[in-house]
Amino acid sequence: MEELQGYLEKDGSRQQPFLYPLLFQEYIYALAHDRGFKGSLFYEPAEVFGYDSKSSLALVKRLIIRIYQQNDFLSAVHDSNKNQFVSHHHKNLGYSHFYSQMISEGFAILVEIPFSLRLVSYFEKKEIPKSHNLRSIHSIFPFLEDKLLHLNYVSDILIPHPIHMEILVQILQCWIQDVPLLHFLLFFLHKYHNWNSFLITPKKSIYVFSKENKRLFRFLYNSYVSECEFLLVFLRKQSSYLRLTSFGPFLERRHFYVKMEHLQMQHLILIVVCRDYFQGTLWSYXXXXXXXXXXXXXVILASKGTHLLMKKWKYNFVNLWQYYFHFWYQSYRIHINQLSNHSFYFLGYLSSLPRNSSTVRNQMLENSFIIDTVTKKFETIVPVIFLIGSLSKAQFCTVSGHPISKPIWADLSDSEIIERFGRMCRNLSHYHSGSSKKQGLHRIKYILRLSCARTLARKHKSTVRTFLRRLGSGLLEEFFTEEEQVLSFILPKTIPFTFYGSHKERIWYLDIIRINDLVNHS
């Protein structure tokens, strides 16, 4: 990393670092390995072909030599008919996958460099303290609770995916002016597509690319979502003379590299909360957050204006993707709903804004009046059906929610099995601590607890009842003790608390920057 910083300092006379020569440096690939790929870059190919971990570095050096002969190298990597590396066809495919993966992850490291430097300089310039708290997923919900209470209509939209790879590269031209690097990326993507055309259909090509080159794909996809965000904010500015009032404090959350910091489940969520043209101020808010594994980005558009205003914005979205991104998007996929009678799924919660009516009798001297008042309350509820679906896919229960054993965990030790189930319970409790109603969360905990008991009983070839009788309350304490200890520091001592979490307080944490797979149903 010191060598990399030294190169960038020497190149500081340029407007932007020239990144292409770094593809020929071994420490770039070592840096990619050290930044959390869990050895997939070096060790997985070594296991497949019988090499030890040290000899994988020799493959990296061979890769660098091949990059000097760009056309021959990429053709050899991605054309299974040319056999320049090894003589056997299957080994050629394996080496091709290894080399393409190294290029992909090495390139992803390079393109993150300018955004990393820009992020550091921005924070130093603005002197923003504790910016990591602003990137917490839970920090979004208090904002929604504050703003949505005054609005009428909402549209929850999925940014269309996928778009053509060339469009993604064109978007990068606005961020990176290194022409050789962009040409190399485009050539690499074309060769990758041609190679996979022998194995898969064109429709599945981008899906396979996203699975095999996760870091690079997420970088390209986040650049696309960031471009959508920039254009939407620009359109909103052009449509109204009203200035942004609450946009400034969250400006650093729109920074591109912030969206890239946690790449395992990292995607952008753009929330645009606006009013009618002549009825008040405009709020615009963007946050980096974890999204579904299917790489879906959500746009929440809410308005205090009329249904016609929302309909105009609906067609703005359609025209934006059709004419700017060359992506055909059906207008019927965007639904406009009233906030008072609509629940939308957002970041692992079912959010709604129900109306509560109450009657108050007012006595003034000899006259009495009956006043009907209507209040709104922002509610966030655990999506039980979605979570049960996720548990069913993970083989913890049936589709109807009946707990079953986890056979693949039966070979683990008892303590490891209990620890894994307990960790899942604690993670779900931690994330869904902001739920208005805890009954759904208790049901999910019950499913996991009984699934744990069935797994242990299966391992010891016993019945669940016999095993629980022998185990006693130890299993229950494993699932709830840690949650009780955490909440005891947060809730006042006067609030009663039991193992079953009977409290109704909503708690939002500032340390949640990604969503567990089971939180998302997709």
Swiss-Prot record:
Entry's Gene Ontology molecular function annotations: RNA binding
Task: Give the stretches traversing the membrane.
Answer: none
**Entry's Gene Ontology BP terms:** mRNA processing; RNA splicing; tRNA processing
Q: Which residues form a coiled coil?
A: none
| GO CC annotation terms, alphabetical | chloroplast
Alphabetically list the UniProt keywords. Answer: Chloroplast, mRNA processing, Plastid, RNA-binding, tRNA processing
Q: Which domain of life is it from?
A: Eukaryota
> Where's it found, cell-wise?
Plastid, Chloroplast
Question: Pfam families attached here?
Answer: Intron_maturas2, MatK_N
The record describes the protein's role as: Usually encoded in the trnK tRNA gene intron. Probably assists in splicing its own and other chloroplast group II introns.
The record's family statement is: Belongs to the intron maturase 2 family. MatK subfamily.
Task: Report the PANTHER family cross-referenced here.
Answer: MATURASE K
Query: What protein does this entry describe?
Result: Maturase K
Query: What species is this protein from?
Result: Iris orientalis (Yellowband iris)
User: What gene does this protein come from?
Assistant: matK
